[in-house]
From Swiss-Prot:
Zinc finger (C3H1-type): 200-228
Statement: the UniProt record of this protein carries the keyword Zinc: yes
Keyword presence, Heme: no
Basic residues biased stretches: 35-44
RING-type ZnF: 277-315
Biased composition (Acidic residues): 255-268
GO molecular function: DNA binding; zinc ion binding
Name by which UniProt lists this protein: Zinc finger CCCH domain-containing protein 1
Length: 343
C-alpha cells in the first residue's frame, strides 16, 4: 500500500535529455538561416493597440499629418519645403548656437577715403629709387673716408652694392637732382589718389575743375581746364527770349526801353572824354588813343614816342600802338555841324 501511496512523476516534470537541450539552445543563438514566415498577418492589431484605442475614445482626439522628411543622401539635395522639420510638435523654435546681427547702420569713414593709399605699386623701400638712395648713401660714406672692415671687403653686396667712385666728380649727389634723368627707373606713382569721373551736358569743359579747381585726371584730362563763365547755346537763347518779352511789354505799356537808358549812358561817357591833348594842352588834331585809353594828338604822340616808349600819363608801355580815336572825331564832327547850323 505504501508503494501505491507514493506520487508518481508526471511526463511534464521529466527533465529533457541533454542533447535535446543543446539543440534548442543552438536554435536560439544561431539565426542566420532562419526562414521568414510567409503567412505573417501584417494588419493584425496587437492587444496593446486595442487598449490604447479604448483609452483614446474617452480623450479628445488630435489628428496630425505626419510626413516623412527626406534626408539628404548626397550633395545634390533640393527641397521646396521649409527648412525646419514639420514633425516637430513643440512650439518653441530651434535656436542656433551662433547668432549674428548687424547694427543696420551705414559705415561711413570720417575722412571719406582721403587718406587711402594705392598699394598696387612696389613698396617704397624696395623700388628702384630706394635702391639708388642706398647706393648714394654708401658712396657718401666711402667719400667721407669711413674705414671698411676686412670682412666687408670680401662680402658680396649685390649688383647695386658696388662702390660709386665717381660720386665726388659729379653733381648728382641726391636722388631729387637726378629724378628727371631716369637713371633710377620709373618715377614713383602717387600713393594718394582720388578718382573723379563726372560729365555734364557740356563735354568740352571739365566740370570738376570749373567748380572746384581740382580734377582727378590732372594733366591727362581730355577736357578744358578753365574756371571762366561760359553760357551754352540754350541758355543764351533763353535769356534773349526773356529780354524780348520784357522789351515788348515795356513798349506796349509806354515805358522807356533800356536801350534809351544805354544811349544816355553813352552820352555821359562822351562827356567824360577829354577835350584837349594831354601833352600840348590844346584841342585835338588827328586824335589817337593808346592801349591804356589815353588820348593825344597824333603828332604829339609820335614825338613823345621817339623819346620815351611809355605812355605820357600812366607810364605803361605803348608798344608803338596808336589807334584812331573815333569817339573824339565823332564829337568834333557834331560840334562842327552845330556851329555851322548856328551861323
Amino acid at each position: 500500500m505504501s508503494d501505491s501511496g507514493e506520487p508518481k512523476p508526471s511526463q511534464q516534470e521529466e527533465p529533457l535529455p541533454q542533447p535535446a537541450a543543446q539543440e534548442t539552445q543552438s536554435q536560439q543563438v544561431c539565426t542566420f538561416f532562419k526562414k521568414p514566415t510567409k503567412s505573417k498577418n501584417i494588419r493584425k492589431r496587437t492587444i496593446d493597440a486595442d487598449e490604447e484605442d479604448g483609452d483614446s475614445k474617452s480623450e479628445s482626439s488630435i489628428l496630425q499629418n505626419l510626413k516623412k522628411v527626406a534626408k539628404p543622401d548626397s550633395k545634390l539635395y533640393f527641397s521646396s519645403g521649409p527648412s525646419k522639420s514639420s514633425t516637430t510638435t513643440s512650439g518653441a523654435p530651434e535656436r542656433s548656437v551662433f547668432h549674428y546681427d548687424s547694427s543696420k547702420e551705414i559705415q561711413v569713414q570720417n575722412d571719406s577715403g582721403a587718406t587711402a593709399t594705392l598699394e598696387t605699386e612696389t613698396d617704397f623701400n624696395q623700388d628702384a629709387r630706394a635702391i639708388r638712395e642706398r647706393v648714394l648713401k654708401k658712396a657718401d660714406e666711402a667719400l667721407k673716408g669711413n674705414k671698411k672692415k676686412a670682412s666687408d671687403e670680401k662680402l658680396y653686396k649685390g649688383i647695386h652694392g658696388y662702390t660709386d667712385h665717381k660720386a665726388g666728380f659729379r653733381r648728382e649727389q641726391t636722388i631729387s637732382s637726378e629724378k628727371a634723368g631716369g637713371s633710377h627707373g620709373p618715377l614713383r606713382a602717387s600713393a594718394h589718389i582720388r578718382v573723379s569721373a563726372r560729365f555734364d551736358y557740356q563735354p568740352d569743359i571739365c566740370k570738376d575743375y570749373k567748380e572746384t579747381g581740382y580734377c582727378g585726371y590732372g594733366d591727362s584730362c581730355k577736357f578744358l581746364h578753365d574756371r571762366g563763365d561760359y553760357k551754352p547755346g540754350w541758355q543764351i537763347e533763353k535769356e534773349w527770349e526773356e529780354a524780348e518779352k520784357v522789351r515788348k511789354r515795356n513798349k506796349a505799356m509806354g515805358v522807356e526801353d533800356e536801350d534809351d537808358e544805354a544811349d544816355k549812358d553813352s552820352d555821359e561817357d562822351e562827356n567824360a572824354l577829354p577835350f584837349a591833348c594831354f601833352i600840348c594842352r590844346e584841342p585835338f588834331v588827328d586824335p589817337v588813343v593808346t592801349k591804356c585809353k589815353h588820348y593825344f594828338c597824333e603828332h604829339c604822340a609820335l614825338k613823345h614816342h621817339t623819346k620815351n616808349k611809355k605812355c605820357f600819363v600812366c607810364n605803361q608801355p605803348t608798344m608803338g600802338i596808336f589807334n584812331a580815336a573815333h569817339e573824339i572825331k565823332k564829337r568834333m564832327a557834331e560840334e562842327r555841324s552845330k556851329a555851322e547850323q548856328g551861323l
